[in-house]
Swiss-Prot record:
Gene name for this UniProt entry: Mff
Organism (species): Mus musculus
UniProt keyword Mitochondrion present: yes
Cytoplasmic side of membrane: 1-271
Domain of life: Eukaryota
Origin organism lineage: Eukaryota, Metazoa, Chordata, Craniata, Vertebrata
Ranges annotated as spanning the membrane: 272-289
Protein name as it appears in the record: Mitochondrial fission factor
Region annotation (Disordered) ranges: 106-134
Claim: Phosphoprotein is one of the keywords in the record: yes
Length: 291
């Protein structure tokens, strides 16, 4: 009802202005003075200026003058329709209570080009080392058929020593993997030292020639193959560690949100309890003073 009355009032107000409003014929700057006005009219005839409202206002001559032609941009602006813009009020409070961290997903992450490339590189390294190992073993078999070499003594390998910093890194998968790599490299170096000491020259055709030990080569190629396999496994472990870290971050975030909500509820309960306690003591004090 109020809206209808307001609209009716606005219509009547607009209609009244349109009917009663008049343009004045003269505009006076100073307050009226009879003597001054009489002198001014006697000295200067037709001193007053009649005010007229033009029917239209033309911009730059309306192409009548070449030097002051109508700009084409004005016609383009007037002919181009403008679409109304709709604005939406942003929310006052932004919370994560509905679905926290939508950009983190508990599902298995999609394989990225970097992870796929690292896996492909590890796979190529393993295949290359296996093929080289097979080719060299075949060459060693042919060489053993043509060359007679004495059987080397049994190499005695010392167990790899563990450094004190290796024991501190056993709490994570990366530490265990680094421990395996370091122990493998130390064992490989010890085997090479022992085999270099036991290598002897072999006589062939009256000349002394130092030939490579097939057992030594087999051990070298086997350990290189193991190193390549461990490198490929480290790439896979990196991808698995990233996925597990993401899951742990999501769990920690949710747990933190639950703790924050519990703290807020506990603060509200404490405020209510404090208010009740203070009111109780004030009431008791007032009753005691009245007695």
């Amino acid at each position: 009802m109020a809206e209808i009355s307001r609209i009716q009032y606005e219509m009547e107000y607009t209609e009244g202005i349109s009917q009663r409003m008049r343009v004045p014929e003269k505009l006076k700057v100073a307050p009226p003075n009879a003597d001054l006005e009489q002198e001014f009219q006697d000295g200067v005839p037709n001193a007053s200026v009649i005010m007229q409202v033009p029917e239209r206002i033309v911009v730059t001559g309306n192409n009548e003058d070449i030097s002051f032609s109508r700009p084409a941009d004005l016609d383009l602006i007037q002919s181009t329709p403008f679409k109304p813009l709709a604005l939406k009020t942003p929310p006052r409070v932004l919370t994560l209570s509905e679905r926290p961290l939508d950009f983190l997903d508990l599902e298995r992450p999609l394989p990225t080009p970097q992870s796929e490339e690292s896996r492909a590189v590890g796979r190529l390294k393993r295949e290359r080392s296996m093929s080289e190992n097979a080719v060299r073993q075949n060459g060693q078999l042919v060489r053993n058929d043509s060359i007679v070499t004495p059987s080397p003594p049994q190499a005695r390998v010392c167990p790899p020593h563990m450094l004190p910093e290796d024991g501190a890194n056993l709490s994570s998968a990366r530490g265990i993997l680094s421990l395996i790599q370091s122990s493998t490299r130390r064992a490989y170096q010890q085997i090479l030292d022992v085999l270099d000491e036991n290598r002897r020259p072999v006589l062939r055709g009256g000349s002394a020639a130092a030939t490579s030990n097939p057992h030594h080569d087999n051990v070298r190629y086997g350990i290189s193959n193991l190193d390549a396999a461990i490198e490929g496994a480290s790439d896979d472990m990196t991808v698995v560690d990233a996925a597990s870290l993401r899951r742990q971050i999501i769990k920690l975030n949710r747990r933190l949100q639950l703790l924050e909500e519990e703290n807020k509820e506990r603060a509200k309960r404490e405020m209510v309890m404090y208010s009740i306690t203070v009111a109780f003591w004030l009431l008791n004090s007032w009753l005691w003073f009245r007695r």
